[in-house]
Amino acid sequence: MALPAVIAISLGGMLGTGIFVLPGLAATKTGASLWLAYLIAAICIMPAAYSKSELATAMPSSGGTYVYIERAFGPLFGTISGIGLWLALVLKSAFALVGIGAYVLVVLGMDSAVITKTVALVFLSAVFLLNIVGAKKAGSFQSYAVLAALVVLTGVFFFGLQAADQTTPFFAKLQNDIVEAGGRMDLIFTIAFVYLSFSGVTKVAAIAEEIKNPSKNLPLGMILSLVIVTAVYVAISFVLTGNVGLQDLNENYSPIHTLAVDLSGPGYEINGINVLGAGIAIIAVLTLISTVNAGVLASSRFPFAMSRDGLLPEFMSRVHKKFLTPANTIAITCIAIAATVLFLDVFEIAKLASAFKVMMFVSVNLAVIVLRETSAQWYQPKYMSPLYPYAQIFGIVTGLFFLWFLGAVPLLSILGIFLLGTIIYYSYGKEVMRTGVLKNYGHRPALYLFNKNTKEQPAEEATSIDLSSLDPKIASDAGAIVPLLGNENSPEMLVEIAAAIQSKKKIQALNITEVPSQTDLDAFLEEPPVASSLRRRLSGLSASKNLAVDFEAVVTHELSDTINQLSSQSSCEWLVMAWDGRSHRGIFISNPIGWLLANINSNLALFKDNGVRHVGKVLLALRPGRKDRNFIEIAQRVCAFYDAALTLLHVVPENTTNKNIFAMEEKSSSKLEQTKTKAEVTIVKSDDPVGTISGMSTSYDLLILGTPEKDNWINVLFGGGKDKFTEESACSVLRLTVKD
């Protein structure tokens, strides 16, 4: 699928209710400033388009937003989002059906709410049968309808631009059939209200696997279609409010027909029917039918997919024996749409649909932040969202801001969806074994509040899983486990460090590959070339250095959980991993290292390899007053392994007295007396410990640091100086977390 097809599909998801029905309702809330509401809404939705593009290139065949959210946040939030997405599409389809009824009636010269709903239900019945039988040609029909709509709307714009004379006041609203002065609050409400118009911008992401060069064409197609449809919305809303009075748009569900009739006048009538208006109505009906069909098609897939995932009753995942379509979920969806048409006010339908779409856009932006910052190994998108994470944060903040202005009913409805989703999950889906990336790797502030290891509230123990389920050959008596995730500069150096710091002899090296939960692990029974290469290299290291190294390759759905299980072995003394030494952990969310620091049962050694291959001088930098006996012992092991000299460094404030320095030096020297390697104590006065240690690291081969004893809110939210030592070090760095 080339770029033009991507643009056509994305446009097809937006051109419908957003231009043929919604502008009439929206115009009565803000008047001539309606075009500005569309423009601002498009800008605020842009980050969601970036985010959806990134997610789609990482999971091209996953099935869309529901799976993205389920993968990032887990089955519970997957259930909630699935229901929310389903309801949003149900509401949008119902809104489109009301528009179909309205456009049919204006052509027939009739005006009746009952007949409008009757016509809507007739068209819904036709769409229901079409989806049960299966309509393979619906996509091409939609493309032609969209093209025709664009051509006609362009003509309407140029025809109406010269006649637009009602552009003041800029802010106005219709209150009890009287035009009153509006304000910025009315504009903000309208911005949130028209979010529904852009709900289809990310629709094309669901078929990313069919797109040629998706890393380029998918985001480009989304952005271009968003720009095109925004131009259409802005242009048509400008000429609509400039030519049609707000009284004529009150409860008007066919505003473009009204605009066409006002522009053409009686000269375009044949037998009492305005030709231009009738032509617009026919194109509107065709486009809206396409919208309803796409809505039923997509929305029926959500309960179907959730049932397949064990989150809804089994009967929803059954397919029709003859037509092979999800007949049960299609029927449930169409019944819900019919009930919405019959019993809900049209304005409330649009408002609720917009609210649910706002929440989904927010969730998509949040999912990208979670997946990026947790560094899930399988998450490797071919397209990376620009301006990360600021674009996503902008999308989240503006979305929540506008959501508030939609009023209490949409907010309560969203709360109801959360409650319903939670009930359904605990009724049907609580046995699902998948967990989201956020739960596996840890949301840092949540970790700080709820999972922090304290004497008053011990951390929850990890679920015990038999290690034989990972691999029967994994050594149960290994003193150190070295997970190799593919980001190591030198796996050999990492294994050497593991051998140096542990007190036992055996080392277990594991090449761990994380794959998405929808991928069957049985597809990876054959050892990949990378693992075979690592096996050969570590075998050579074992022979040359006389080390007891076992190597195995492991495939898992949950990287951190697997590492935690491995470290839970009673004999495992150390978990040794490569580390990039990032000082900034991202906004609000930690990477897997943060999760491991709070959850693993063994000691943790993080090694940042700066390319040093000969270790002759080791610098141990510890804060004065720290319990440093364990660190000195480990540093001595490293020095003995490499036959290196040890320097114990304390950096103290400039105002420290000489008396205190002398006492500190005596105490530290006494701790080094029993070392079998060459060792010395160095104390430096400085109010810039990062700069001091960084400068001294140029004279050493390995810097050993401890993990800070406690976090504060600045470090929790934004990262802190604790990693700046590592980031600015000239030599390799070994950061140790010793469990008490």
Per-region residue spans from a language model:
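Terminal cytosolic tails of multi-pass membrane transporters
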Residues: 369-388, 413-490, 497, 519
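Membrane-interface "cap" regions at the ends of multi-pass membrane proteins
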Residues: 1-24, 28-33, 46, 50, ...
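Membrane-interface loop-to-helix entry segments
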Residues: 115-166, 181-182, 199, 222-227, ...
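TM-loop-TM module centered on a large, flexible mid-protein loop between adjacent transmembrane helices
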Residues: 67-68, 106-110, 177, 221-293, ...
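Gly/Ser-rich helix-loop-strand patches that form or flank binding pockets
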Residues: 566-614, 697-740
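Hydrophobic transmembrane alpha-helices that form the core helical bundles
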Residues: 25-29, 37, 46-124, 128-132, ...
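C-terminal membrane-solvent junction of multi-pass transporters and transport-like membrane proteins
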Residues: 316-325, 361-410
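Small/aliphatic-rich secondary-structure junction motif
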Residues: 465-530, 550-552, 617-682
